[in-house]
Amino acid sequence: MKRIPLRKWAMAASFAISATAFAGNVEHDQTSVWKVSKGDDAVYVGGTIHILPISEFPLPATFTETYEKSDTLVFEVKMPAPTDIEGQQKMMAGLAYKDGKSLKDDVSEETYQALNVYLANFGATADQLAQFKPGMVASMLVAMEAQRSQLAGQGVDAYFMQLAARDGKASEYLESLDFQISMLANMGAGEEDRLISETLETLPELKDMLKSTIKAWREGNTKKIDELVVDTF
């Protein structure tokens, strides 16, 4: 059986797009930023990664240079800040089971027990997560393992969102929060047990996989990124 692509949980397959009306050529080392131009107008497309430890900062200089030249940044989605109580409640409600159902109803006893065993490493239990749908649980597992591997971090998108807010740069978004919630809520629909069980099986590989992906991303090694993220699956 083909494994569910955990790599797609751990790194951004999507792009953050930075645009500026008038930008000259940017001389830089190879990294994951590409320029599309017509006349004096240019759009810079930056490949981003959502899990990036603090040790990976500062970012390659091209990211900063491109940001400084840009007047508008276009991100994947605007996620609610931790202080946005209404937004956080909306996410939690959209990713939780309703009508008395729980994760126990969608996974086998064996998988539920395996989840319990894994969560015991963090002083938690499967029952504490059972209110959430499998997509949310799987993403939480990846975040927890990244934290344990000392690889957790805010990521490139969040970093530039903060800079844009600080500097008063315009920000736009490709997707709505409702779309993101729906996508995550329906992740693994019909294959809930497989999603959780294979996520648990793949977590031990996360540290090495993330390190390889981050290295390829920093170097703009699209061939290696294809190998890690696309060709493998």
Predicted regions and their residues:
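Compositionally biased, intrinsically disordered low-complexity regions used as flexible
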Residues: M1-R3, F15, A23
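Bacterial N-terminal signal peptides
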Residues: A10-T20
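Structured, acidic catalytic/metal-binding patches in enzyme active sites
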Residues: G24, S32-F233
